[in-house]
């Protein structure tokens, strides 16, 4: 994805960028001041269409500046227009190989079709959809998988029931309930 360094920070400059089909953005690098950028709106939206729902926090993008240098980044914040749902602003965080990052990793429940509790008339309720973790960029999982196939009525699975790699440190209580089977 191409990134253009922008100098104008006034409201009129930002509105002009949006009229030209650009998205104003800020790139944060550890220990430095944020860099103001502009991203092509059509290009970003085409990438965004291919990202699975809920997986944006763990999707790594490559920004290419005017000089041709590449930077691997994560989207830290995205702002949408209320009425049109157009992307209005982006915040990126640059990934540095030897620096740990905090990230929200999506949790996907598998085995819901064959779940014992669902077959008995219950409903699967996923209480937590993301787990906050701290890890190196190379160790970041794209999602966590939680098998709920053997859950019966009124049974639950907790964060500690997931397979979390040793290189990943959870930043939330591992006794939190992720999914539960409830009566209709």
Swiss-Prot record:
The keyword RNA-binding is assigned to this record: yes
GO MF: 5S rRNA binding; structural constituent of ribosome
Pfam families in alphabetical order: Ribosomal_L25p, Ribosomal_TL5_C
Disulfide bonds: none
A GO cellular component entry from the record: cytosolic large ribosomal subunit
Keywords for the protein's UniProt record, in alphabetical order: Ribonucleoprotein, Ribosomal protein, RNA-binding, rRNA-binding
Keyword rRNA-binding part of the UniProt annotation: yes
Domain of life of the organism encoding this protein: Bacteria
UniProt cross-references to CDD domains, sorted A to Z: Ribosomal_L25_TL5_CTC
Entry's Gene Ontology BP terms: translation
Coiled-coil boundaries: none
InterPro entries: Rbsml_bL25/Gln-tRNA_synth_N, Ribosomal_bL25/Gln-tRNA_synth, Ribosomal_bL25_b-dom, Ribosomal_bL25_C, Ribosomal_bL25_long, Ribosomal_L25_dom, Ribosomal_uL5_bac-type
Subunit structure: Part of the 50S ribosomal subunit; part of the 5S rRNA/L5/L18/L25 subcomplex. Contacts the 5S rRNA. Binds to the 5S rRNA independently of L5 and L18.
NCBIfam families attached to this UniProt entry: bL25_bact_ctc, PRK05618.1-4
Family of the protein in this entry: Belongs to the bacterial ribosomal protein bL25 family. CTC subfamily.
HAMAP family found in the cross-reference section: Ribosomal_bL25_CTC
Function of the protein: This is one of the proteins that binds to the 5S RNA in the ribosome where it forms part of the central protuberance.
Protein name (database record): Large ribosomal subunit protein bL25
Organism of derivation: Protochlamydia amoebophila (strain UWE25)
Gene that this polypeptide is encoded by: rplY
